[in-house]
Amino acid sequence: MSTRSVSSSSYRRMFGGPGTASRPSSTRSYVTTSTRTYSLGSALRPTTSRTLYTSSPGGVYATRSSAVRLRSGVPGVRLLQDSVDFSLADAINTEFKNTRTNEKVELQELNDRFANYIDKVRFLEQQNKILLAELEQLKGQGKSRLGHLYEEEM
């Protein structure tokens, strides 16, 4: 955690750009942690984006962010929006899309196999009905027909 003070004019605080204001400048303190920057003793008024300088072992980094302030009558600590790293979210999203695509392909293959089994069962049911009809026809003819067929075969 590091603490630093920034001196800026009220114009710069209000409009965010470099300017010459007739008002005296004021000093503002910022506390920077590993993930957030807090402004100490801030007044509650609209804020434009500002450049924040964060020091780390690799050097000094500048980031633009807009201040988010609580709307109450008491001045307090305000939080600044963090920049979001979408690379991890993109990787997870890509992995999810790949998994989802693979699952869809597997389900389509299983659905095709199931449809083939259903077609085979319907075909076998039709064959069974035909065989049952032939059996009933043969039963209805009686022994004379069966005997006649037997003799023809001999």
Swiss-Prot record:
Main location: cytoplasm
An annotated GO cellular component: axon
Entry keyword set: Acetylation, Cell membrane, Coiled coil, Cytoplasm, Cytoskeleton, Glycoprotein, Intermediate filament, Isopeptide bond, Membrane, Nucleus, Phosphoprotein, Ubl conjugation
Location of the region described as Coil 1B in the Swiss-Prot/TrEMBL record: 154
Annotated region described as Coil 1A, given as residue ranges: 96-131
Stretches for region Disordered: 1-31
One annotated GO molecular function: structural constituent of cytoskeleton
Residues in cross-link Glycyl lysine isopeptide (Lys-Gly) (interchain with G-Cter in SUMO2): 104, 120, 129, 139
Function comment: Vimentins are class-III intermediate filaments found in various non-epithelial cells, especially mesenchymal cells. Vimentin is attached to the nucleus, endoplasmic reticulum, and mitochondria, either laterally or terminally. Plays a role in cell directional movement, orientation, cell sheet organization and Golgi complex polarization at the cell migration front. Protects SCRIB from proteasomal degradation and facilitates its localization to intermediate filaments in a cell contact-mediated manner.
Recorded domain comment: The central alpha-helical coiled-coil IF rod domain mediates elementary homodimerization.
Assembly and interaction partners: Homomer assembled from elementary dimers. Identified in complexes that contain VIM, EZR, AHNAK, BFSP1, BFSP2, ANK2, PLEC, PRX and spectrin. Interacts with BCAS3. Interacts with LGSN. Interacts with SYNM. Interacts (via rod region) with PLEC (via CH 1 domain). Interacts with STK33. Interacts with LARP6. Interacts with RAB8B. Interacts with TOR1A; the interaction associates TOR1A with the cytoskeleton. Interacts with TOR1AIP1. Interacts with TOR1AIP1. Interacts with DIAPH1. Interacts with EPPK1; interaction is dependent of higher-order structure of intermediate filament.
Protein name (record): Vimentin
